[in-house]
C-alpha cells in the first residue's frame, strides 16, 4: 500500500498546486473524491485491471464520471490512464486532503461517542483540540454504542480515550497484572 502512496503523491501535489493556483481547491477535492469512488466500483475495478488501451480506459472513465470532472480533471485522468495509475486515485485523494490540511493549518479529528454529542460539547472538544494541536480542527463524529459513555478522540497518531469501555479495559489490565 505504501507503494500506492508513493505513486499517488506527485499526482496529488500537481493537482493541489493547480487547484491553489486557480483558486478552486474545493472543486478539485470534489472531483478527486468522485473519481476515487468510481475506481471502487466493481465493474470499473475490472476495467482498471484489464488490458484496455489507455485512451479507451481514459475515455470510459471520463464517460462514467460525466460532468463531475471539468476539463482539467479530465486531463488528470488521461495522464493517469496513460501511466496506468488510475487505481491509485483513492490515494491521490488522501494525499490531496493531507496537502490541503497542511496548507490550511487544519487537523482532522475523529470523535467517537456512544450517543450524538450536543453543539456545546462539540464546541468544547473543538476548542480543547485547537489549543492542544495549535491549529484549526475539523471534527468527524462517529457513533459507536460499544463506547458505552464518554468519547474517544483521535488526531493523527494521538488517541485520547475517555470512554467507559477504555476505563474498564484499563481496570481489567491492572487487575490481571
Swiss-Prot record:
Keyword Iron: no
Entry-linked SUPFAM superfamilies: N-terminal domain of the delta subunit of the F1F0-ATP synthase
Family matches, as InterPro entries: ATP_synth_OSCP/delta_N_sf, ATPase_OSCP/d_CS, ATPase_OSCP/dsu
Highest taxon above the source species: Bacteria
Record keyword ATP-binding present: no
Annotated protein name in UniProt: ATP synthase subunit delta
Protein's cellular compartments: Cell inner membrane
Stated family: Belongs to the ATPase delta chain family.
Organism per entry: Enterobacter sp. (strain 638)
Membrane-related topology note: Peripheral membrane protein
Amino acid at each position: 500500500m505504501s507503494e500506492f502512496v508513493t505513486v499517488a503523491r506527485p499526482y496529488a501535489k500537481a493537482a493541489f498546486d493547480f487547484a491553489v493556483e486557480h483558486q478552486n481547491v474545493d472543486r478539485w477535492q470534489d472531483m478527486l473524491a468522485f473519481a476515487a469512488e468510481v475506481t471502487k466500483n466493481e465493474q470499473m475495478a475490472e476495467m482498471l485491471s484489464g488490458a484496455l488501451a489507455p485512451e479507451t480506459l481514459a475515455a470510459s472513465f471520463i464517460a462514467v464520471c460525466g460532468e463531475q470532472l471539468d476539463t482539467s480533471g479530465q486531463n488528470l485522468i488521461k495522464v493517469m490512464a496513460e501511466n496506468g495509475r488510475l487505481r491509485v486515485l483513492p490515494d491521490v485523494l488522501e494525499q490531496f486532503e493531507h496537502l490541503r490540511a497542511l496548507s490550511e493549518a487544519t487537523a482532522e479529528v475523529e470523535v467517537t461517542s456512544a450517543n450524538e454529542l450536543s453543539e456545546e460539547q462539540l464546541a468544547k472538544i473543538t476548542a480543547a483540540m485547537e489549543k492542544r494541536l495549535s491549529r484549526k480542527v475539523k471534527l468527524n463524529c462517529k457513533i459507536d454504542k460499544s463506547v458505552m459513555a464518554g468519547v474517544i478522540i483521535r488526531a493523527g497518531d494521538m488517541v485520547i480515550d475517555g470512554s467507559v469501555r477504555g476505563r474498564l479495559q484499563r481496570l481489567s489490565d491492572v487487575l490481571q497484572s
